[in-house]
Every structure is written in structure tokens, then in C-alpha cells.
């Protein structure tokens, strides 16, 4: 799925000209969040998922995030890790790629700072800078992959923020979905995340 009219022509062609029997791309009248909501709903429907033999290669599938972890290990080693600490700055909308960096840190990689770079769709930057995760209208930009109102993978980090309490995480996310806003007291172990808004 892709948001109709909200990708570049090159991106649209990459998605819509694949000639494979097991690939079907559909343009959705909406934004990237609408596409993600539809995909999540399909994956939540277990009988449908099994009947259609669905798979996803975006960051909804944790395998994609796991596959990105070696990028950070490779980069850090080339910068002198483990003897030298490193910082990473990652343009992000859906929080998947930087979540891979965070996972690498949990495995022992000496990352001392994470800089979350965003465009005008800055829900992550606002949350990290001001503890303000409130949903706003998505504004189209020159970086459509970052034009996201709600970062799908943030729930995975929230699980860590909330002491790996699955019930509290589920309740917090349900409250967020109904109210459109969230504030969380992050533990000290998560304070090395920083926001940076791109120009």
C-alpha cells in the first residue's frame, strides 16, 4: 500500500511496476498512517492472514529491524568501537531504523547518544524534547517516508520505557489511540535519546 499522490514518481514506479505474481500494490486515498493502519488490521486478522499468506517487509515485521542492527555494529566498529563510544543521528518517521540502533546498544554496542531527526511531522521530536506525543495532521514534505503522524515502532520502545510491562504498554497505547496524546516518564536509561528537527 502507498498513499496516493504522496510519494515521488520514482517511488511510485518502484512500488507499482513490480512484475511478480505475489506482489500487489494499492494506492490508498490517505496518508502513510492510513496505509499502516490497514496493514496492521490485516495482520491482526489471523484467519485472513493465514488464508492470504501475508508477509510484510516493512518495520511492522521485527525481522526488518533485526536485519538493520548489523549496520550499526559495522559502522561503530569502523569508528573505533568498542574502545570508542559513538553517537548516531537517524532521520526517522516510523522509528524502525533508530530502534535497530537502540537494540544494538542493548546488546552492548557503545552508543552514547541517539539523535532522532525529523521533518515537520515531528511527533517523535516533540515527544523526546517536550514529552508531548500528540497527534497532528500529517503535512506532506519532500521526504514522504517520514510523513508519519504516529510512529508505528514507538510502541516497542514504550514497552522498554514502561519497564517491559505488556499490560501497561497496551493500556497506554489504547489510551493514546482514543485521546490522540501521551506523556510518559521515561527512565534514566532512556534519556540518551535526543530530538533534532531537520530544516
Q: Where are the model-predicted features located?
A:
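Long, charge-rich alpha-helical interaction segments
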Residues: 174-180
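Charge-dense, low-complexity intrinsically disordered segments
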Residues: 59, 144, 192
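Aromatic-anchored, charged helix-turn/loop surface patch used as a conserved interaction hotspot
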Residues: 180-190
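Domain-scale recognition of functional cores that engage charged ligands
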Residues: 36-41, 46-105, 109
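Single conserved hydrophobic/aromatic residue that forms the stacking wall/gate
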Residues: 192-195, 199
